[in-house]
């Protein structure tokens, strides 16, 4: 016989709930309406989880687990995976046999009760005790028989589901055989006969006349017995139906009048009309609905029916029951959280949890986000597949876009990184710290390329030219690298000879620090992140050959030379066993303090983090105004400083060679109609006249009268156009950026639109308005024309028109080549996407298998970190007390505040799962990002739960943190109070 229940530790995995932890509970099989379901109960309480088994079982597996115990694993076709451990072998075998019968579609034979057969219905019937049967009979007698059962109780917890279900099955199967009634005091007895139930109808009608409780919510078992699918002749009588319907209508009207006086009319009327809509003749489909609704009634509702005077809560649940039709496990965002779209995570593209966790932690750094989006970076000038462009686009859209849109942006970010680091191109699990390092290095390279390209674009004037200050300002435009200004810091290593004291210093830049786990002492409390950091900066003795005295030993010290805004610490939790070739994760407990201090690792010359208002452009422009040139300076940017002077001939030729391709691209934006050409020629003639007047006034000493007199007309035209371009360069750059950049993000309207890759490429090159392509742009065409000696033509408009016609032919050829390249690229992209989809499916299945196996061993080792050769930090009693106090208050100088943790759940680096805990300064609350799922949490919970799995820690300088926090409090004093009440359900 298949057992009714099996007990043991339970774990589930489904699309709705994810992977749960091991909890004590039970598996219970419920059979109703020829359908079999599995109900999972937890000993700690809560809503049971129901899984349909009919036509949904994929496999059933038994795995021995000790003596006379085993583990039962059930895999469903809807990707759900259920496991119960430590089950007695006999019970597990019986349940497996029953599940195999359901899997082989033999549930009708397994569910019919017959003498001597191991029927499930017989088991359920026999498990109903006399006490429960009497209670059920007492309840049924005190309720009024309704005409129709509403679905108001579908959302209730099905604790008593088993009691009613086997009784109905037994009645239906035994009524035809005429089995004698042995248990007349049980209303739902398997051997109850039809005449006995008819007598119950009469007694219930008399009781209903004396006491009239709300029938739509208090009577639910009775219609199940009187269902039309049974052989009950009393209910098939039309006269009985008519009388019962009339009585029900009178009861409803009377109850509506009573509830109207109590102020619950809207909910009651909703319930009333809901019941009227279902008052049709009984049929097979309606009986199925009645059974499903009755089976979900709770025990508490059956025991306290006399106190249900206000049906408002049930009416609300009735509205929710329609949404819960597919099961209680379906995740549904509360209505109050819909306006808060920023509380969304990132979709897992296939083992990309490492990427999602790192991105959420980086995006939570407000100063990093501001430096990336709000300094006016010319995104149009950056290649489409550059990581910094993809990175900024995702950051700008993450709080305002749907998960589908963000999923496409995530794919683009992954593609941009995979183009440089192929190890991230597939769908295998990767290390989060490796991804972080690659991401930061690639962002710095992109900013360096941008600054180098931007440096060569404007043409500088000489010292005596008008508008020189504005041109110098444009020429020295340097964009701030978000990585350098926020995350990069500098450490000075000092090697001191122990013999003669000779000191050799070396400076090194870091984006993060990889610190060792401190050695755990069994007699002392657990070590902290502060101990690991101090361990990294401890002085150590090395073998060193001194050039001065030929000494053989020296001491190395490490001190901060420049502090970062945000300090990233990578805790080395993995140790590689060379003998076994295994990568083992050390689950040693490490205390996570709220504040760290770098006081003992700084000197008097240590530079503080950059202020929030700092920018590389302002750092260069200020000394320019005093000296009018930049000879040498040291700034925290990814590019060297730009020189203030350019040689006239060499600088011009270098500029032309570096911007030749860009000028050709700019020509694409011009229209080709004759009116625009003629208007441009007229503007050119006007510029020529004005430039001659400026020549007579002596504005350019190096282009004096003697110089112009010795020039030909072609050379004169080139010189004059060069002057006009300098005068219009600043205004042109402003006009270009103004319509395409937003003040907050720098992305224009076309960037915000989600377009395919080829459409986005075309969007960046669409023509501008004729008003924006003024004389300065036309001078660039003429300059290219003058630069190319093969294309020189005699003076006159006809020669220029011939040149434009020749350029039209070149452009048509380029467009044809572009179309061919796009077609080939699309074919390659389709093939690549198909291959990626196949790889994704295989990788997902492999990852789930590895993750399930790793969870069994994911408790974590509490052994020593294996750093036997590493000395432990020793503090005096006063120092230890001071560090302990600072960990909570941050009162010491150079303190850093915890703002994010990236944790790894699993036993090896090749499997497991990454999540991130982030402190949101705007909301002043902690959130846990688990791929697409976001939940609110507490800082103490984060510190406690991540002490064995914390992998990467983000700490922000206390002064920067306090400044950002104060800014948010002053900016939104009222909205934050409203926001807290709205976001409370999270």
Curated annotation (Swiss-Prot):
Motif mapping: KEN box 1: 32-34
Renumbered to this chain, motif D-box 1 spans 71-79
Instruction: Cite the USP domain residue spans from the record.
Output: 344-958
Which residues are the active-site ones? 353, 913
Entry's Gene Ontology cellular component terms: cytosol; nucleus
The sequence motif named KEN box 2 is recorded at 224-226
Any keyword Cell division? yes
Extract one GO molecular function annotation from the record: cysteine-type endopeptidase activity
State the protein's purpose: Deubiquitinase that antagonizes the anaphase-promoting complex (APC/C) during G1/S transition by mediating deubiquitination of APC/C target proteins, thereby promoting S phase entry. Specifically mediates deubiquitination of 'Lys-11'-linked polyubiquitin chains, a specific ubiquitin-linkage type mediated by the APC/C complex.
Put simply, this protein is called Ubiquitin carboxyl-terminal hydrolase 37
Give the gene symbol: USP37
């Amino acid at each position: 016989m298949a057992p009714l229940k099996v007990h043991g530790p339970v774990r589930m995995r489904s699309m709705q709930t994810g992977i749960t932890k091991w909890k004590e509970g039970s598996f219970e099989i419920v059979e109703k309406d020829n359908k079999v379901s599995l109900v999972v109960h937890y000993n700690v309480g809560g809503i049971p989880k129901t899984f349909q088994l009919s036509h949904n079982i994929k496999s059933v597996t038994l795995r021995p687990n000790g003596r006379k115990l085993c583990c039962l694993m059930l895999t469903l076709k809807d990707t759900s995976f259920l496991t119960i451990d430590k089950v007695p072998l006999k019970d597990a075998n019986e349940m497996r046999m029953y599940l195999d019968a359901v899997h082989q579609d033999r549930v009708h034979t397994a569910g019919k009760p017959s003498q001597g057969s191991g029927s499930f219905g017989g088991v359920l019937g026999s498990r109903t005790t006399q006490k429960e049967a009497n209670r059920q009979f007492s309840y049924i007698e005190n309720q009024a028989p309704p005409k129709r059962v509403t679905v108001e109780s579908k959302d209730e917890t099905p604790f008593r589901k088993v009691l009613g279900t086997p009784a109905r099955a037994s009645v239906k199967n035994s009524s035809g055989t005429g089995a004698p009634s042995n248990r007349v005091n049980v209303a739902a007895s398997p051997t109850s006969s039809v005449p006995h139930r008819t007598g119950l109808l009469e007694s219930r009608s008399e009781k209903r006349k004396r006491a009239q409780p709300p029938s739509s919510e208090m009577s639910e078992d009775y219609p199940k017995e009187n269902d039309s699918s049974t052989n009950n002749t009393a209910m098939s009588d039309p006269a009985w139906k008519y009388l019962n319907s009339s009585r029900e209508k009178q009861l409803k009207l009377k109850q509506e009048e009573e509830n109207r006086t109590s102020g619950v009319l809207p909910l009651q009327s909703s319930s009333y009309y809901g019941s009227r809509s279902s008052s049709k003749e009984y049929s097979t489909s309606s009986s199925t609905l009645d059974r499903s609704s009755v089976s979900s009634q709770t025990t508490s509702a059956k025991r306290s029916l006399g106190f249900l005077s206000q049906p408002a809560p049930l009416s609300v649940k009735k509205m929710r029951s329609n949404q819960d039709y597919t099961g209680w496990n379906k995740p549904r965002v509360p209505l109050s959280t819909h306006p808060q779209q920023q509380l969304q995570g990132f979709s897992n593209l296939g083992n990309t949890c490492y990427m999602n966790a790192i991105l959420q932690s980086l995006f939570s750094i407000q100063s990093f986000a501001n430096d990336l989006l709000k300094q006016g970076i010319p995104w149009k000038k950056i290649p489409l597949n550059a990581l910094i462009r993809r990175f900024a686009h995702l950051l700008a859209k993450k709080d305002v876009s749907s998960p589908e849109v963000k999923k496409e942006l995530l794919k683009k970010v992954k593609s941009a990184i995979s183009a440089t680091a192929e190890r991230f191109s597939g769908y295998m699990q990767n290390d989060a710290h490796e991804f972080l390092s690659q991401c930061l290095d690639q962002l710095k390279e992109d900013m360096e390329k941008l600054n180098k390209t931007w440096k060569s674009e404007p043409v500088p004037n000489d010292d005596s030219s008008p508008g020189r200050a504005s041109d110098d300002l444009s020429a020295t435009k340097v964009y701030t690298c978000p990585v350098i200004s926020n995350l990069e810091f500098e450490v000075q290593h000092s090697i001191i000879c122990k013999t003669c004291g000779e000191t050799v210093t070396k400076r090194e830049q870091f984006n993060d620090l990889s610190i060792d786990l401190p050695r755990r002492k069994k007699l002392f409390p657990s070590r902290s992140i502060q101990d690991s950091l101090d361990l990294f900066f401890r002085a150590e003795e090395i073998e060193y050959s001194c050039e001065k005295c030929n000494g053989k030993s020296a001491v190395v010290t490490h001190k901060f030379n420049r502090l970062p805004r945000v300090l990233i610490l990578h805790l080395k939790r993995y140790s590689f066993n060379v003998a076994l070739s295994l990568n083992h994760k050390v689950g040693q407990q490490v205390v996570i303090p709220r504040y760290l201090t770098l006081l003992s690792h700084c000197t008097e010359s240590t530079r503080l983090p950059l202020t929030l208002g700092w920018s590389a452009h302002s750092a260069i422009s200020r000394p320019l105004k005093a000296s009018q040139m930049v000879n040498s300076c040291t700034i925290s940017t990814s590019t060297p400083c730009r020189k203030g002077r350019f040689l006239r001939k060499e600088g011009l030729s270098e500029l032309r060679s570096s911007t030749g391709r860009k000028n050709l691209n700019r020509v694409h934006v011009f229209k080709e109609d004759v009116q625009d050409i003629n208007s441009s020629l007229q503007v050119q003639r006007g510029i020529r006249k004005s430039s001659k007047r400026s020549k007579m006034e002596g504005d350019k000493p190096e282009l004096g009268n003697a110089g112009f007199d010795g020039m030909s007309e072609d050379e004169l035209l080139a010189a004059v156009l060069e002057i006009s371009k300098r005068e219009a360069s600043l205004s042109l750059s402003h006009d270009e950026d103004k319509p395409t950049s937003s003040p907050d993000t720098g992305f224009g309207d076309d960037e915000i639109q989600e377009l395919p890759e080829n459409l986005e490429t075309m969007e960046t090159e669409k023509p501008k308005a004729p008003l924006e392509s003024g004389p300065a742009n036309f001078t660039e065409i003429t300059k290219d024309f003058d630069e190319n000696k093969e294309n020189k033509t005699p003076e006159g408009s006809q020669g220029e028109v011939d040149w434009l016609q020749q350029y039209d032919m070149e452009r048509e050829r380029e467009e044809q080549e572009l179309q061919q390249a796009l077609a080939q690229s699309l074919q390659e992209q389709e093939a690549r996407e198909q291959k990626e989809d196949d790889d994704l499916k295989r990788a997902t299945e492999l990852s789930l298998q590895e993750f399930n196996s790793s969870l069994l061993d994911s408790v974590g080792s509490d052994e020593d970190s294996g750093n036997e050769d590493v000395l432990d930090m020793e503090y005096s009693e006063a120092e230890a007390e001071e560090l302990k106090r600072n960990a909570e208050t941050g009162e010491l100088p150079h303190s850093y505040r915890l703002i994010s943790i990236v944790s790894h759940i699993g036993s090896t680096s090749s499997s497991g799962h990454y999540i991130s805990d982030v402190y949101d300064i705007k909301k002043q609350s902690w959130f846990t990002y688990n791929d697409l799922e976001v939940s609110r949490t507490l800082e103490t919970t984060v510190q406690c739960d991540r002490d064995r799995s914390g992998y990467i820690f983000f700490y922000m300088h206390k002064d920067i943190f306090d400044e950002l926090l104060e800014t948010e409090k002053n900016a939104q004093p009222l909205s934050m109070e409203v926001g807290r009440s709205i976001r409370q359900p999270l």
